[in-house]
C-alpha cells in the first residue's frame, strides 16, 4: 500500500536517541501532539526515567530505539 501512514505508541526521541525528560503530563502532551500524536503523557519511573510517552505517534517522528543515548 502506498500513501498509508501508521502510528505507534513509544517514547519520542531527540535526534541523538535520547528521550525527552519530563515532570508534567501537560508538557509531554503538548510535545507529542505538536509532532502529530493523538496524545502523550509523562511516564514516571519508567525504563528511561521520567520520559515522554506518545500515543499514536506518526512513523516519521523519531522514537527511542535500543542502544545508548548519544549525548
UniProtKB/Swiss-Prot annotation:
Alphabetical GO biological process terms: defense response
Disulfide bonds: 18-69, 22-42, 28-52, 32-54
Main location class: secreted
Signal sequence residues: 1-6
GO cellular component, as recorded: extracellular region
The record's note on its domains: Has the structural arrangement of an alpha-helix connected to antiparallel beta-sheets by disulfide bonds (CS-alpha/beta).
Residues of the propeptide: 71
Domain LCN-type CS-alpha/beta: 8-70
Any one Gene Ontology molecular-function term assigned to this protein's record: sodium channel inhibitor activity
Entry's localization field: Secreted
Record keywords: Disulfide bond, Ion channel impairing toxin, Neurotoxin, Secreted, Signal, Toxin, Voltage-gated sodium channel impairing toxin
Annotated SMART domains: Knot1
Chain's role: Alpha toxins bind voltage-independently at site-3 of sodium channels (Nav) and inhibit the inactivation of the activated channels, thereby blocking neuronal transmission.
Gene3D superfamilies, per the entry: Knottin, scorpion toxin-like
Keyword Signal included in the entry's annotation: yes
Tissues showing expression: Expressed by the venom gland.
UniProt-recorded name of the protein: Sodium channel neurotoxin MeuNaTxalpha-12
Similarity annotation: Belongs to the long (4 C-C) scorpion toxin superfamily. Sodium channel inhibitor family. Alpha subfamily.
Species assigned in the record: Mesobuthus eupeus
Domain of life, per lineage: Eukaryota
